[in-house]
């Protein structure tokens, strides 16, 4: 975070310092550039902002100003990369892809480079020195660094090819809603980022070199870049929506599986509930059995108590009334021995007399 904040502060300082430098360079360019240069540059087609590169004078002051401008542009590019954040990784990936382009594109770009090369050898030498100086911060963006004017068409051609490929691939991807996005589309998106980031550098140099004459052309080249920038987020949003739409069923399937799995825990909970209920019922049964046993035991115990109490009472009464009981038993025996004679017995005696 601290590094990014420092880069932002540097970019703000450079942005404030650039207008004054641009004015000075524009005045010096108007005074030193030959009158035929703007006509040549305006007559040549400008397909992209990367092709807008002008010749420079052979004086030492022009080269110093070029180096200063390039240093400032590199600082601005670094700040823009720091602000872009995660796009840097994608641009690095796209740069690696652009380095792997076939040799046919290099041959075609060299053929397109011939009409753009200047006629004067002095201007060629100055262009070579300027491109070699600029090749250090910006070289490697479009394959192997080439000195002289050959670096211009390679950058421009690579930008054209990447823009065409990106346009076709994004249209095809939008027409065909697929769940997986091919790496070509990713490279096309990153290739779109390239001209916008690369385009910032040559537009700044074109203003310093050609002055007022190329200001309109650079503005015109910036307009499609803005349009590309505005179209990029819309295409990115559409592709993101397609990706989300494609990933929704994929995400829904695990959700459905989770929903299917949810009855499992609920069923297990029900089983646990039934187990707990059965355990409770068993405990109740055991408690009832134990209570029944205790109640039976208690009932038997009370029966034993009652019988014991009755026996104690009988024994107590018998013990206290033993004399009466003995007398009653003995009287019965005595009565049997000494019983009274009956009337019949008396009648028999009288008859005998």
UniProtKB/Swiss-Prot annotation:
Residues 131-178 are annotated as: 6 X 8 AA tandem repeats. It is found in: Cell membrane; Golgi apparatus, trans-Golgi network membrane. Residues 23-293 are annotated as: Disordered. It comes from the Eukaryota. A motif (Endocytosis signal) lies at residues 346-349. Residues 1-17 form the signal peptide. Residues 29-57, 265-278 have a biased composition (Polar residues). Residues 137-150 have a biased composition (Gly residues). The chain crosses the membrane at residues 299-319. Residues 94-107, 161-178, 186-200, 220-242, 279-288 have a biased composition (Basic and acidic residues). It holds the Pfam family KCT2. Its main location: membrane. Residues 18-298 are extracellular. Sequence repeats lie at residues 131-138, 139-146, 147-154, 155-162, 163-170, 171-178. Residues 243-259 have a biased composition (Acidic residues). One of its GO terms (cellular component) is plasma membrane. Keywords: Cell membrane, Glycoprotein, Golgi apparatus, Membrane, Repeat, Signal, Transmembrane, Transmembrane helix. It is a single-pass type I membrane protein. May be involved in regulating membrane traffic to and from trans-Golgi network. Also found in strains BALB/c, C57BL/6 and DBA/2. This is Trans-Golgi network integral membrane protein 1.
